[in-house]
Amino acid sequence: DALDRVNLPGAPEITVVMGPKAPWLEAVRERAGTMRYPSQVLAGVSNMARLMTVSDLAIGAAGTTAWERCSLGLPTLQLVLAENQQKVAVALEAAGAALTVSTPDEIAERLTHWIAGNQVSGVLADLGRSAASVTEGSGTQMVVREMGIPHA
């Protein structure tokens, strides 16, 4: 609903990614069909990294996917949906890698403010750069090295 209330610049397309057993999946699909912007709802995807690389902005929880978004330099408005996400949210916001929002209204307010001030591209670029600097994206190699497995 928040995105539908904002006059987004350009020709935005909205992609919502959910788990295949998400309790609100059907309700979200129904709402996507009534959005003023073209919207699709995907469930149980196997190409999340690709979806992230073609996105300009993510709105998502400060859980484990937050690190994937950082690895790809994807600007993010993050929500804390569980207690164990609080420290991640604080750390990412302190690093300038994500901005924490508490409610859908706050999402709409932030976007409206950026658009009104013609700041969208600058804010997203800054968030993306900071996000990319949080992780080097070579975690697999680090784990392999720590396990003492020789390179192939």
Regions inferred by a protein language model and the residue ranges of each:
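Nucleotide-activated sugar donor-binding and catalytic core shared by glycosyltransferases
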Residues: 1-152
